[in-house]
Amino acid sequence: MNSAAAPRDFHLLAKPSGSTCNIDCTYCFFLSKEALYPNDRSRMSQATLETYIFQLLESQPGAEVVVAWQGGEPTLMKLEFFRHSVALVQKYLKPGQRVQHTFQTNGLLLDDDWCAFFKQHGFLVGLSMDGPREMHDAYRVDRRGKGTFDLVMRAWQFLAKHEVDVNILCTVNAANEHHGRDVYRFFRDELGAKWLQFIPIVERASADTLALANQGWSETPGRKRLLYTQEGHLVTERSV
């Protein structure tokens, strides 16, 4: 009797633009990585794209496959790159496989062409937004330090116009942590968002803060944030 476990489905997240981004969120841990890859060497080539799509589809044991794009900011790769990625999926799709395309973006470059493409191919688009204007603009700023709220709202309107499925990705940070109800009502009532996801911006616990990490949310003035412990060096969040 063969007791070997059956192969399990797995999920991969691709960052075709590497760490390159067109905004400068002050809580982002990833922007400094650009210095490691000069001369655009972090950008995914057409050859690498084809190899990636082929291997992703070929190695999946199950019928459900997610092709997920993130960044940096993936729209910097231009729309034609993702048109080609969809064509490659169709080229290498195995019999019985079903593909879900997902795409995480700050929204600044979205327009009618992008959103028509997303709708045509059934993309689930994650749009990064931290709440109403004053909360969003506290950290999600451009390279000049100017808030990006108006540009993200424009992206939301393009997505809504084309009836694209959208998941709002909101970080929980020092600007909005005490305004959960306001944030939720903004997304639910003003935007009419159907899918919401919240990710805390947290700080690793050091030896000096271990007791506080074990305690969880601190009631000490100025320390009302969650610390965490970890093994290894796989998590790279930065606190604000």
Language model region names:
Residues 1-116, 120-121:
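Conserved alpha-helical substructure of the radical SAM core
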Residues 125-126, 152-156:
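A conserved non-catalytic segment of reverse transcriptases
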Residues 119-125, 191-194:
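Glycine-enriched alpha-helix->loop->beta-strand junction motifs that scaffold or abut catalytic
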Residues 67, 101-103, 125, 166-168, ...:
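Hydrophobic/aromatic residues located in beta-strands of well-ordered beta-sheets
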Residues 33-35, 72-76, 107-112, 124-145, ...:
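Conserved radical SAM core fold
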Residues 26-27, 130, 211-215:
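Short, flexible, mixed-charge acidic loops at enzyme active sites
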Residues 142-150, 157, 161-240:
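Radical SAM enzyme [4Fe-4S]-AdoMet core and its adjacent flexible, acidic
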